[in-house]
């Protein structure tokens, strides 16, 4: 093979790997987080776990990606090690799907039907459809379909290019002698493992082996140990991802290694013993692409079947390899679910971000309600809790904000990108709500320390204000947690009512001050209090408006709110009237 042949082969390999990656990314985006959510929740039954592991891997076209995802689930405590074992087994079966797709390149025959099955016949059509969807369609779903079709076409073209480039090696004696050397089981396993460890994809390395079949020099005796080694080499990705993870995550990575390593040993020992007694006629024949796919599938199904009754033993072996220590019972860190491993699968990472954001929202709401209660029933311990919770919310914002920024730099779908932006905006509002909770607790502390108290009329007005603030807080956060757009639309009318309440309470206080029914000192406290209340309502409005804008693809906040409050907006006016009547202050003459 001359330099141009080598360049053609390497170029074909580059196209092959790029196509595989593009197709996998497109499939992952199209499926969204549905498969991952199922994987996360439906793994209690071993058979379900195996099927789901196979399904997810067949879709995202990478057993390594599935296993890394599982390591992340185990590391964050979402999945137990016993659940992970079945998924890992299934991932090994699912990864064989790629080799079956690639086996289409080896189809022989001159009939019209056989010609249509050849990739050279249909991949140009798929490429045309794919590029049309990518360039012309505005729908993100159609763009993802286009990416899948283009990825598949490039994958097949790369495979054909590699096969054509290596075909001249059929008459190269040096090449044949190298392949003969790999028919030695030990050397073949090592070669397959090293190749797969380097490119970190067993599907890709099996594809390369299938391309080499075009030379006619690859026999099944050579291919078998290489395929066995490829299954071992794919474990490197999971082992690397487990570095720095907790002990259970390390055990999950080792389960993947033991499954393939011990499965390879058992399979090869049995195969070579049987072959020695009853020689297989096909073993010294030239391998083809379909034969490689069959061998790859048979091994992974065989390994799953022999391990299925011994899943507990596999789990125990992992525990023996990574032992617990006496000081390993440290409390679980809730931020473990923001695992960097999930960033490789953005839809999974986004689900974890939503989970943390919900906890942050609940913490901010509880903190504010606790601080509001201090105005009527003060105690120092609750003030401490308010301050502790505010610091906790700050940590939430720091950890979650940093993770979201990392996630935002990934290749996200338009929908996921909008969700990341919404979360970044909302967590800032949650943090500010907790800050106002501290301010309110300081008002309560000042009143308690100085022995101050509001007038009876002011207490009645604040009680009504409390009710309105509690409702807008619950409405905004419940809408956020459930993604309820209709509920979010109730926030802005109530926020306007709260603005009016603040103005009216302040005006009434000025009147009482003039009549000597209230002191200037209490006026400062009241002003601080209702200002903090009104600011909290503003942040609730920000949360709801952000949700609605993301949903409606409208990003001009000022114009949106202006349109919302327009006199011809019947829905807004109707809700505003209902809230105004519900939170109406007592008659002014009676309060003076």
Regions inferred by a protein language model and the residue ranges of each:
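Interfacial loop-to-helix junctions that mark the boundaries of transmembrane helices
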Residues: 1-7, 109-121, 175-181, 221, ...
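Helix-loop-helix hairpins and the membrane-proximal interhelical loops
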Residues: 1-46, 145-194, 212-215
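Hydrophobic core segments of alpha-helical transmembrane domains in multi-pass membrane transport
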Residues: 8-22, 53-57, 125-137, 150-162, ...
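Short helix-coil transition sites and intra-membrane helix breaks within transmembrane domains
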Residues: 24-28, 57-65, 166-167, 195-204, ...
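Hydrophobic alpha-helical transmembrane segments of multi-pass integral membrane proteins
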Residues: 42-69, 185-208
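Membrane-interfacial helix-loop connectors
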Residues: 69-91, 99-121, 159, 196-233, ...
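Cytosolic, long alpha-helical scaffolding segments
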Residues: 79, 105, 218, 244-250, ...
């Amino acid at each position: 093979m001359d330099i141009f042949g080598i360049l053609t082969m390497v170029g074909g390999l580059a196209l092959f790997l790029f196509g595989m990656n593009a197709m996998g990314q497109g499939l992952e985006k199209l499926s969204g987080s549905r498969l991952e959510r199922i994987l996360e929740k439906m793994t209690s039954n071993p058979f379900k776990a195996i099927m789901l592991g196979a399904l997810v891997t067949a879709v995202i076209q990478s057993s390594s990606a599935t296993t890394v995802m599982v390591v992340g689930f185990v590391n964050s405590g979402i999945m137990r090690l016993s659940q992970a074992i079945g998924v890992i087994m299934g991932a090994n079966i699912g990864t064989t799907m790629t080799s079956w797709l690639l086996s289409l390149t080896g189809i022989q025959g001159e009939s019209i039907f056989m010609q249509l099955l050849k990739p050279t016949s249909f991949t140009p059509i798929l490429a045309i459809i794919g590029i049309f969807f990518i360039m012309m369609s505005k729908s993100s779903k159609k763009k993802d379909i286009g990416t899948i079709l283009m990825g598949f076409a490039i994958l097949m073209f790369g495979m054909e290019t590699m096969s054509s480039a290596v075909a001249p090696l059929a008459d190269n004696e040096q090449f044949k002698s190298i392949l003969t050397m790999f028919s030695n089981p030990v050397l073949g396993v090592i070669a397959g493992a090293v190749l797969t460890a380097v490119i970190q994809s067993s599907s890709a390395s099996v594809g390369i082996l299938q391309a080499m079949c075009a030379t006619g020099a690859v026999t099944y005796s050579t291919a078998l140990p290489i395929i066995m080694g490829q299954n071992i080499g794919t474990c490197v990705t999971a082992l690397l991802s487990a570095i720095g993870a907790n002990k259970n995550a390390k055990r999950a990575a080792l389960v993947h290694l033991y499954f393939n390593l011990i499965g390879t040993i058992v399979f090869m020992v049995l195969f070579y013993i049987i072959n020695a007694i009853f020689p297989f006629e096909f073993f010294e024949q030239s391998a083809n692409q379909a034969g490689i796919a069959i061998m790859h599938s048979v091994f992974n199904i065989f390994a799953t079947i022999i391990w299925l009754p011994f899943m507990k033993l596999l789990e125990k072996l992992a525990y023996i390899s990574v032992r617990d220590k006496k000081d390993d019972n440290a409390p679980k860190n809730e931020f473990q679910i923001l695992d960097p491993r999930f960033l490789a699968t953005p839809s999974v990472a986004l689900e974890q971000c939503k989970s943390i954001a919900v906890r942050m929202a609940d913490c901010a709401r509880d903190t504010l309600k606790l601080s509001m209660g201090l105005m009527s029933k003060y105690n120092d311990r609750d003030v401490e809790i308010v301050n502790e919770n505010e610091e906790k919310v700050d940590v939430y914002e720091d950890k979650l904000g940093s993770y979201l920024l990392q996630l935002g730099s990934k290749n996200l779908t338009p929908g996921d990108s909008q969700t990341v932006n919404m979360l970044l905006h909302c967590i800032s509002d949650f943090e500010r709500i907790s800050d106002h909770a501290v301010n309110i607790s300081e008002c309560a502390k000042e009143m308690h320390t100085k022995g101050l108290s509001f007038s009876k009329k002011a207490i009645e007005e604040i009680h009504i204000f409390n009710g309105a603030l509690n409702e807008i807080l619950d409405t905004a956060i419940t809408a956020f947690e459930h993604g309820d757009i209709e509920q979010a639309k109730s926030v802005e009318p109530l926020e306007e009512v709260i603005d009016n309440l603040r103005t009216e309470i302040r005006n009434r206080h000025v009147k009482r001050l003039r009549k000597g029914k209230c002191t200037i000192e209490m006026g400062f406290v009241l002003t601080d209090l209702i200002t903090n209340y009104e600011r909290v309502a503003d942040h609730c409005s920000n949360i709801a408006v952000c949700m609605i804008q993301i949903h409606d693809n409208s990003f001009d906040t000022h114009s949106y709110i202006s349109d919302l409050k327009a006199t011809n907006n019947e829905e807004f006016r109707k809700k505003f009237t209902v809230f105004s009547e519900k939170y109406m202050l007592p008659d002014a003459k009676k309060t003076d």
